[in-house]
Amino acid sequence: MSLSDHGRKLHICVDFLLPRISPNISVSLRSIEIDMLGHYYSYLDQMRHLTNDWLIIPGHDWPYFGGGVRAVDLIEHHDKRLDLLRGAAANGPITTAGAMHALFTFDLTDHELFFASCEARAHLNHLVARNEMQIQTEDGIEYFYPG
């Protein structure tokens, strides 16, 4: 959820349009199949039209101007992440764990591991929603194939 005041050109974005980092876009463990990244792309598509005179108030860091530019940066960031997964799946089917290794090339703490797995799955779900990947379950493990 975010709030906008068009008269004052003020947008309170909570964690969705942070100035320095990409927010964690994750699936819910209760609804693992939902395309959360698709929802986020829709939000960013709306925000990319903000002019530079809008004041953005995030839930972390400091207020800033340039929310439209930041939205485009975040779209490009997630596009690159999707490209990494397309490349990983080109060599054979990948699991959510395989997607995590493609997206996060550094050692993860236990806390980071949870968020990384949910974010990796959100990116895989988006590729499925775009019909760029298919899911096949074998022995209780979900594999993601190009297609």
Where are these regions (language model features)?
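C-terminal regulatory/interaction regions
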Residues: 84-147
